[in-house]
Amino acid sequence: MEFYYPNYINDMWRIMGYIFHGDRNWFVDERAKCFKKEMIVEFLLDKGIALYDTASAIRRLQDNASDKFLEVVTPTDLPRLLGQIPRCTAIVTTGQKATDTLCDTFHISQPAIGSFSPFVTEGRELRLYRMPSSSRAYPMKLEKKAVFYRKMLEEIGLL
């Protein structure tokens, strides 16, 4: 995969456009039916948002992207990764498999959707936020999902 949340049907970049610019199509190239990757990268760099996978190797048990049918073969070395980004204060997950992987790695309880679980690793205090999935398969309107994301972004100081 070339980039995170590249599927035109996924609403991650629409949620971010809606929150930061008041326009769900801010990062959308409607003609080409794709996202404006360069604008997204610039936005992420400007805001100090990093994206990464919780697994470096997975096995798809069925021919779809559902978390239910993904097996984590090799989890990402998250403590090592966090050591490379010392200013990171929060981790955000949008899927159950990522949440499970993080909770298992750091031995923390799962936060409810829209909230966080505090945890300490290597002497650092962090928060694990659990957001609603940006997939349209998750039964919630984009504007309602944006309420959860906005609250989290305000709490971590990005809004």
Where are each of the predicted segments found?
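Extended aliphatic helical segments
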Residues: 28, 39-41, 72-73, 92, ...
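Internal catalytic-core helix/loop-beta-alpha segment
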Residues: 46-105
